[in-house]
């Protein structure tokens, strides 16, 4: 939830960066690159499908790997002819056009062999026999070295696809290697294709990681050097800075198709080209054959990737990036530079990053930055191999094994960083790692060992281009293994705020560790419990029509047919509206229903269901099929709190409910009619606390006992308490003005009635007064400041309890 940005004019020169959210970072060039890259991926997909049909055994491992390598080679050739790497434009196209469909396969095999052969090692008579083939340069780099690749026979369709759609009608030199690498890998990865299409990390999201990690600082340093008015000093510093860029080493331990590495390489080369502009002054600059004006190299980039094909794509994407930036350098220096044969190579290793010793990939003495977007998989969705990975990293029985898979990369990174504390790391991760149980379980441990968050992006939506994938909500966390004195950068909704500390909840607040099993609530507070759990397969539930029918047919059952509510009902039902009923036989007389065939049929189905359950606690309840599996129904009227609620609402909808209405386990119950309790729970203070520490389902709030039991309650005067009771009642009165509206209607930020909004605002002020958040204090106007004060109160309460 965004807060107002206040920038004093006197500080504008230093704090202008905080206005960055006003600027549209996108531009037509980036948009064009993205469109071209996605179109390129679609062309590759067509080629892939056409070739796939031609293999004798397309599902064999050898055929699939051959098909992937074939597509990578073709893409490199298509790019090389459009970028002028091979020589004249259209060279690859013209060579292929000289073959009919039957001869095209052999022509391609011959070309691949020539591209992998040094000029001095080629047949000396090749120029006479086949001058078109002999004109192709030596590529190097290992891209064409595997002669065991299986190339199937061509068809007219493939020939036309390759010559017309892929070559004549498309310009491959315009692709973005950052985007295309990921799109390409997604297009050709069978698992990804089956899951619904293309996936890639946008350039914008990559920069959310690399800009605060290192790029912003490098840009600022270069700008400062360029502003030096003394040419001799400026030139010397530019050369030192260029050597600095060439000395930096990067590791992406889950590099996929290399998009983080590729975009980082492009960013460093753009800085280097800016240096060359300053040094050359627009004049032709001569270099000897043994030296190059370019010092930044793809050999500074290291990656680990479990998928063999993605490794090949990553290397190819970096070569394409190298070629594109070399063209830019040529324009600056006004001299031609030789791209082929490939002289450098990125160090992308195929392997499981959680079982590979990272120092065997890159010596820690060389390493400066670790970054990437490791896979995030919840405990319930892990494969057996992934579960084994987690145990290998954290140890058997460790509480961290129940957390998200992505935290394994944090642990491996920190283990390396402890030996080289100057290394900085930043990962994209699921937002769950900074919520709920992850904070006291993982962050408490690593922070106690010296780790510190240097910058973070709070939760934001991360969508792929897949047609079927659900929206994912992510955070970005940049951290070190040791404390640094510098201010931290906290990004929320695209706005950056400089703060002194960022805690595990990604708040500008002190470190607090709120575990779900702790209970720090005052004695006067009612216990919070989940509603009753049916575990009945739906057989104890009735629609309104079924309830009416049973009541008329069997009057003795009327007292057992009860209204039912839960999280969905309390939010979406209108007052008095009942969408579900349930059979509630607690303390019932078996004579009323034991011989009822309709009831017995339902109970037998429940018994069978429970007997077959994998959960021991459910199997034990098979003999009590007439009862809910877990009964936690209050004996008095109660407050109902839905377990899940959308984050688009400022207040979590809560309501009073009659003890005669059965509450299910999709909501929590508080056996209380206290207006004071209701007022506090419905305040902006309690909702801010919930937003800060609760778990999430996507971005939806996941209320829990940990939120309630650890909430720091105020110590109000009798007058303040009475005021809160009045404002709480005013909320209920305002709701009652709209009997045809559900809480979902009333609490929609766009349609909230003015009477209800005013009642909540009055209640908010009354509660803040009880906390001492008086007018003019930061906690009164800023949610983050309010949460910071609540965390201080929580820490004081815990410390006081521990000292007793």
Can you name each region flagged by the protein language model?
Residues 28-33, 51-61, 163-171, 186-204, ...:
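Glycine- and acidic
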């Amino acid at each position: 939830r965004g807060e107002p940005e206040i920038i004093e004019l006197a500080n504008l020169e230093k704090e202008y960066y905080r206005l960055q959210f006003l600027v549209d970072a996108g531009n037509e060039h980036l948009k064009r690159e993205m469109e071209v890259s996605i179109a390129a991926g679609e062309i590759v997909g067509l080629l892939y499908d056409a070739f796939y049909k031609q293999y004798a055994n397309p599902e064999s491992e050898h055929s699939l790997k051959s098909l992937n390598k074939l597509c990578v080679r073709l893409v490199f050739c298509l790019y090389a002819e459009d970028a002028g790497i091979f020589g004249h434009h259209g060279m690859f196209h013209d060579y292929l056009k000289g073959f009919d469909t039957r001869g095209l396969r052999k022509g391609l095999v011959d070309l691949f062999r020539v591209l992998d052969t040094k000029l001095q090692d080629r047949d000396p008579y090749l120029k006479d026999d086949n001058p078109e083939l002999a004109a192709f340069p030596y590529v190097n780099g290992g891209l064409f070295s595997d002669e065991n690749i299986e190339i199937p026979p061509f068809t007219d369709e493939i020939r036309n696809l390759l010559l017309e759609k892929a070559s004549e009608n498309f310009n491959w030199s315009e692709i973005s290697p950052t985007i295309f690498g990921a799109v390409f890998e997604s297009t050709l990865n069978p698992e990804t294709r089956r899951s619904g299409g293309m996936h890639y990390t946008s350039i914008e999201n990559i920069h959310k990681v690399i800009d605060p990690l290192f790029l912003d600082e490098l840009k600022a340093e270069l700008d400062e050097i360029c502003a030096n008015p003394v040419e001799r000093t400026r030139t010397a510093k530019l050369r030192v800075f260029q050597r600095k860029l060439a000395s930096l080493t990067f590791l992406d331990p889950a590099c996929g198709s290399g998009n983080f590495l590729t975009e980082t390489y492009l960013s460093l080369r753009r800085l280097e080209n800016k240096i060359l502009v300053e040094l050359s002054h627009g004049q032709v600059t001569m270099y000897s054959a043994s030296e190059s004006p370019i010092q930044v190299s793809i050999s500074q980039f290291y990656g680990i990737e479990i998928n063999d094909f993605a490794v090949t794509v990553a290397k190819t994407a970096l070569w394409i990036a190298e070629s594109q930036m070399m063209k830019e350098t040529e324009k600056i220096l006004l001299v031609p530079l030789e791209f082929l044969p490939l002289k450098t190579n990125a160090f992308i290793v195929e392997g499981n990053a959680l079982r590979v010793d990272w120092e065997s990939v890159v010596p820690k003495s060389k390493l400066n930055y670790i970054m990437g977007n490791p896979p995030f998989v919840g405990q319930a969705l892990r494969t057996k191999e992934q579960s084994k990975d987690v145990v290998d990293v954290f140890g058997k029985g460790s509480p961290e094994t129940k957390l998200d898979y992505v935290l394994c990369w944090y642990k491996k990174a920190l283990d390396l960083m402890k030996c080289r504390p100057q290394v900085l790391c930043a990962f994209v991760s699921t937002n769950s790692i900074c919520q709920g149980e992850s904070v006291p379980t993982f962050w408490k441990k690593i922070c106690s060992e010296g780790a510190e968050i240097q910058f973070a992006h709070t939760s934001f939506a991360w969508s792929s281009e897949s047609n079927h994938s659900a929206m994912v909500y992510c955070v970005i966390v940049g951290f070190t293994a040791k404390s640094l004195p510098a201010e931290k950068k906290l990004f929320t909704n695209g706005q950056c705020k400089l703060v002194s500390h960022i805690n595990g909840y990604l708040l500008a607040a002190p470190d607090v560790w709120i575990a779900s099993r702790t209970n720090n609530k005052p004695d006067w507070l009612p216990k919070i419990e989940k509603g009753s759990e049916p575990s009945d397969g739906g057989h104890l539930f009735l629609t309104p029509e079924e309830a009416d029918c049973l009541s008329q047919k069997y009057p003795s059952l009327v007292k057992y047919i009860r209204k039912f509510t839960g999280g969905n009902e309390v939010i979406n039902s209108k007052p008095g509206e009942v969408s579900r009923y349930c059979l509630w036989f607690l303390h019932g007389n078996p004579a009323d229903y034991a011989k009822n065939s309709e009831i017995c049929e339902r109970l037998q189905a429940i018994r069978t269901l429970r007997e077959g359950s994998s959960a021991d606690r459910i199997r034990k309840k098979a003999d009590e099929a007439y009862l809910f599996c877990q009964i936690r129904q209050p004996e008095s009227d109660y407050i109902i709190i839905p377990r899940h609620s959308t984050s688009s609402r400022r207040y979590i909808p809560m309501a009073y409910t009659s003890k005669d209405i059965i509450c299910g386990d999709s909501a929590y119950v508080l056996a209380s009619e206290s207006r004071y309790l209701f007022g506090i729970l419905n305040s902006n203070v309690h909702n801010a606390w919930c937003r800060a520490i609760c778990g999430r389902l996507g971005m939806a709030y996941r209320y829990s006992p940990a939120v309630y039991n650890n909430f720091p309650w105020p110590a109000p005067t009798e007058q303040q308490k009475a005021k809160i009771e009045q404002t709480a009642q005013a909320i209920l009165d305002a709701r009652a003005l709209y009997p045809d509206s559900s809480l979902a209607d009333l609490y929609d930020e766009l349609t909230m009635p003015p009477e209800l909004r005013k009642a909540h605002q009055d209640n908010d002020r009354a509660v803040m007064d009880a906390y001492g958040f008086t007018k003019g204090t930061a906690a009164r106007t800023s949610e983050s400041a309010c949460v910071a004060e609540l965390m201080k109160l929580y820490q004081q309460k815990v410390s006081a309890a521990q000292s007793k």
